[in-house]
């Protein structure tokens, strides 16, 4: 049964504010950038089969900052290759920011961008109707499987689009992170049946294992300062609590008992550690690299 709250993503301006605060308070983008610069190039070395044009797809690309860093690494590894880049992103605001970033970025002439303002499921339907035979060299799905109805089916579909030497890259929170503990404890109270907000990489690995699909995995160490969550009435703390629970105005709308239980779990050693009087949440991510 769906939880009796409004989900944060229903209020896009508040979601965006909480997401931007999360990025400010966490090392998430830094750990992704480290992975992109230090590990991804070797993963990308074997794709493309010597073709002169690579087909690349970003699913849930957001404002494109991480996409463009990956494309830059791809270009360094394959400097003479052109790229057809499919961008799948349902948010007008994010697509606008992505396009603005492209327009002010030098040296992107080797990339042809196709903009798809739609969800992953809408894109899947369109793809099957228009270009079912087309194959991709590299697909990335970064922190987006929380927002699909069936994460396993979504992974299976996009994996089916890969060239024989293609790669599908997925980044999600680790099952051993603070998110894993929080969601395991409060799945019934906080998670929604129509959106799989509580999925971790552990569940995707279990699915792939059950299907006999091999993958490589990498852990990205990340943390987030959530100290303000424990100060009653602190606006930034309330925004972070919204982001952590995926509930709009959780502090105002949650029953006192649930609020106390959530805060207790957030302080628990399985979720966070105390460093110099600050509460530091375990925001570890994992990367899966999947082949056809």
UniProtKB/Swiss-Prot annotation:
**Subcellular location, principal:** cytoplasm
Catalyzed chemical reaction(s): histamine + S-adenosyl-L-methionine = N(tau)-methylhistamine + S-adenosyl-L-homocysteine + H(+)
Residues making up the signal peptide according to the UniProt record? none
The name this protein carries in UniProt is Histamine N-methyltransferase
Positions that bind S-adenosyl-L-methionine: 60, 89, 142
Q: What is its EC number?
A: 2.1.1.8
An MF annotation (GO) of this entry: histamine N-methyltransferase activity
Q: Please name the gene that encodes this protein.
A: hnmt
Keyword annotations for this protein, in alphabetical order, are: Cytoplasm, Methyltransferase, S-adenosyl-L-methionine, Transferase
UniProt-listed GO biological process terms: histamine catabolic process; methylation
- Function text: Inactivates histamine by N-methylation. Plays an important role in degrading histamine and in regulating the airway response to histamine.
- Where, per UniProt, does this protein localize? Cytoplasm
InterPro entries named among the record's database cross-references: HHMT-like (IPR016673), SAM-dependent_MTases_sf (IPR029063)
Give the residues the record marks as binding substrate. Answer: 28, 283
Q: Name one GO cellular component term.
A: cytoplasm
Any single Pfam family the record assigns to this protein: Methyltransf_23
> Assembly state and interactors?
Monomer.
What species is this protein from? Danio rerio
Query: What family does the database annotate?
Result: Belongs to the class I-like SAM-binding methyltransferase superfamily. HNMT family.
